[in-house]
C-alpha cells in the first residue's frame, strides 16, 4: 500500500464515524422569532457562566443565532437573565 492509499482510507473512516450535523432546535419547532421571555429556551444556549454559546456548539442556524443573541441581551436588560453567573460575583 502506498502512502496515498493509507491516507485516503484513514480519512474515509474518520468521516464515516464523524459527529452528526445538529439540527436547529428553533427550525425544528417551527419558531420564527426567538422570544426573550422564554427563559428556559434561552438558558439552553448559554454557558454556566452566562455567556452565549456559539453556533457550532448549539447547532442553531445563522438566522436564529442572530435573533437568539438579541433575545438574550434583551432578557438580560429586562433582568430575566443574569449578566454574570451567581457564583462569579460573590
UniProtKB/Swiss-Prot annotation:
One of its GO terms (biological process) is translation. It comes from the Bacteria. GO terms for cellular component: cytosolic small ribosomal subunit. InterPro entries: Ribosomal_bS18, Ribosomal_bS18_sf. One of its GO terms (molecular function) is structural constituent of ribosome. Keywords: Ribonucleoprotein, Ribosomal protein, RNA-binding, rRNA-binding. Binds as a heterodimer with protein bS6 to the central domain of the 16S rRNA, where it helps stabilize the platform of the 30S subunit. Belongs to the bacterial ribosomal protein bS18 family. Part of the 30S ribosomal subunit. Forms a tight heterodimer with protein bS6. This is Small ribosomal subunit protein bS18A. It comes from Roseiflexus castenholzii (strain DSM 13941 / HLO8). The gene is rpsR1.
